[in-house]
């Protein structure tokens, strides 16, 4: 869900409701006349933090860690809320994390979310793919075969 800006309602996450969840609610704004700080966007495993008037925008909600690639990586974190006093950051590449929001009307610029990733992992006792497109990274370790794309691609078994 998206974080709220000055005096606006935050957005709901996981709408419509699905299992597994598709994210959490965004945080509320500080709703102050001066020093409006937006709430952070909801992440995969936690709601976005509320903004604190004239102090700080809300952090994005935490993502979810997964070891499907062979190493623990956190995916789908929420973007930070916008502020009147700083420029937003971008989402981390290849994790699907949210980008930072912009501040009140004329301050700063909202930034892009992180690009996505597709990972397929299966036991290496099964045959390798017959073909792939899109130049995936392919690793075989720990009893698994892992195909990882950070752009368009396909796989045929």
Show the residue positions of the predicted features.
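Low-complexity, glycine/proline-biased repetitive segments and flexible coils/loops
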Residues: 1-157
């Amino acid at each position: 869900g998206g974080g709220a800006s000055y005096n606006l309602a935050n957005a709901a996450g996981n709408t419509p409701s699905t299992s597994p969840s598709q994210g959490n609610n965004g945080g509320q704004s500080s709703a102050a006349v001066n020093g409006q700080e937006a709430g952070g966007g909801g992440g995969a495993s936690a709601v976005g933090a509320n903004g604190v008037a004239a102090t700080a925008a809300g952090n994005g909600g935490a993502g979810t860690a997964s070891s499907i690639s062979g190493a623990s990586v956190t995916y789908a974190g929420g973007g930070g809320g916008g502020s009147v006093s700083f420029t937003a950051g971008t989402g981390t590449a290849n994790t699907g994390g949210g980008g930072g929001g912009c501040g009140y009307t004329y301050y700063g610029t909202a930034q892009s979310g992180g690009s996505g990733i597709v990972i397929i992992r299966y036991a290496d006792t099964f045959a390798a793919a017959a073909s792939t497109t899109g130049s995936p990274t392919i690793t075989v370790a720990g009893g698994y075969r892992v195909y990882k794309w950070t752009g368009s691609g396909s796989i045929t078994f």
